[in-house]
């Protein structure tokens, strides 16, 4: 829209509201948000973590560290932020509506599309048909647009589930945790803890190997007692966090992914984000990839008069990078769930996370990278 395109966003929800909790945005995504004029608003609602600290689940010993904060910004040209999902949604929605007050259409569920050489028609569940020049499917892991492009395949259940909850900092001991990302690693599970909303809220995500729970929705509540049992015997810091979570505010969902594919497009339609390359959350790059996708798609459309050529350029420049992140995230799940200190030490020695992330993950700039 900022580039002059006439855009309509069809959203299945009846209203734009809060869902989910924290997301992490590294410099490679934040540069795009800055391009959209959102630097000040992002800084207002976010937290800049000092570092990733990978800790042993019981002793809390730090096994590996990735510096962030000033070092990340100096090296990569933009901050590393933690932000509440609803805050970044609101910031983006406000910017969209500033550009065009009629851009967002609610209560609109996509079920497929039709296309020919003259255009593409989005089909909605209530019978509406929306005509346009190009269709961008950003409708998640169960994307109906993806199904039509790639073929209908079920997402792969990984045998892992994720817990999420938040705790207001006033419920925690004073100076409970520094402003870091603490990743607690242990047998068959791990936990990720960091601050949100200018440090007012602590975000907790716990990933557990559990093949019994296959509910995919992020909004389904589960038993606090089950959460407590999943992390029995873990460090006192984890116990303090769990003990201060509201018992009726525990959410649990199954972690699904798909193997990378080599086509996301037709001549007039394309998918991006989770609709194209859903991933496990272990590289904290799911939202980041979607933001990168948007930037590269915009640049591809600007560079080509022919829509099919633009979509091909977008795909050509995104397939390898997103596949690397998807596969790398799966591998990290194995590393985080080893069973002994000795295994963790060997694992982190083999895989220098700080080095690899700084060399290729964070160094990528979707606004300036050469498109081929």
Regions from the language model: what does each represent?
Residues 14-34:
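Conserved N-terminal glycine-rich FAD pyrophosphate-binding loop of Rossmann-like flavoproteins
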Residues 179-214, 220, 224-233, 255:
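Active-site substrate-recognition segment that forms the wall
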Residues 28-168, 211-224, 228-230, 366-372:
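Conserved N-terminal helical subregion
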Residues 351-372:
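C-terminal auxiliary extensions adjacent to catalytic cores
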Residues 105-106, 157-159, 176-180, 201, ...:
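A short coil-to-beta-strand element that immediately follows conserved catalytic motifs
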Residues 44-47, 103, 233-249, 307-312, ...:
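Acidic/histidine metal-binding catalytic segments
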Residues 2-14, 136-137, 163, 193, ...:
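Conserved mid-domain beta->alpha element of the FAD-binding
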Residues 1-5, 32-35:
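A short, Lys/Arg-enriched amphipathic alpha-helix followed by its capping loop at the start of a domain
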């Amino acid at each position: 829209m900022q580039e002059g395109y006439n855009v309509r966003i069809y959203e299945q929800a009846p209203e734009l509201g809060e869902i989910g909790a924290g997301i992490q945005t590294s410099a490679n995504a934040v540069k795009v948000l800055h391009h959209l004029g959102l630097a000040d608003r992002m800084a207002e609602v976010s937290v800049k973590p000092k570092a990733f600290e990978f800790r042993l689940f019981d002793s809390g010993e730090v096994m590996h560290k990735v510096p962030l904060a000033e070092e990340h910004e100096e090296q990569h040209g933009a901050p590393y932020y933690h932000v509440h999902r609803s805050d970044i949604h609101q910031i983006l929605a406000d910017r969209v509506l500033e550009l065009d007050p009629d851009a967002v259409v609610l209560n609109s569920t996509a079920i497929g599309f039709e296309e020919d050489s003259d255009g593409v028609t989005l089909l909605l569940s209530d019978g509406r048909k929306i005509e346009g020049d190009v269709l961008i499917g950003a409708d998640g892991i169960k994307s109906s647009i993806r199904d039509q492009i790639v073929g209908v395949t079920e997402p792969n259940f990984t045998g892992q589930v994720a817990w999420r909850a938040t705790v207001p900092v006033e419920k925690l001991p004073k100076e409970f945790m520094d402003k870091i990302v603490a990743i607690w690693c242990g047998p068959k599970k791990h936990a990720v803890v960091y601050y949100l909303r200018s440090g007012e809220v602590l975000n907790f995500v716990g990933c557990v190997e559990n093949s019994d729970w296959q509910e995919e929705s992020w909004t389904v509540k589960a038993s606090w007692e089950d959460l407590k049992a999943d992390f029995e015997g873990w460090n006192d810091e984890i116990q303090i966090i769990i003990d201060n979570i509201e018992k009726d505010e525990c959410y649990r969902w199954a972690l699904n992914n798909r193997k990378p594919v080599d086509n996301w497009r037709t001549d007039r339609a394309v998918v991006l984000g989770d609709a194209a390359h859903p991933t496990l959350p272990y590289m904290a790059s799911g939202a980041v990839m979607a933001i990168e996708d948007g930037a590269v798609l915009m640049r591809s459309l600007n560079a080509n008069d022919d829509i099919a050529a633009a979509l091909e350029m977008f795909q050509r420049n995104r397939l390898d990078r997103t596949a690397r992140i998807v596969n790398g995230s799966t591998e990290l799940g194995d590393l985080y769930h080893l069973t002994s200190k000795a295994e963790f030490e060997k694992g982190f020695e083999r895989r220098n996370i700080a080095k690899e992330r700084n060399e290729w993950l964070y160094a990528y700039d979707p606004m300036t990278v050469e498109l081929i």
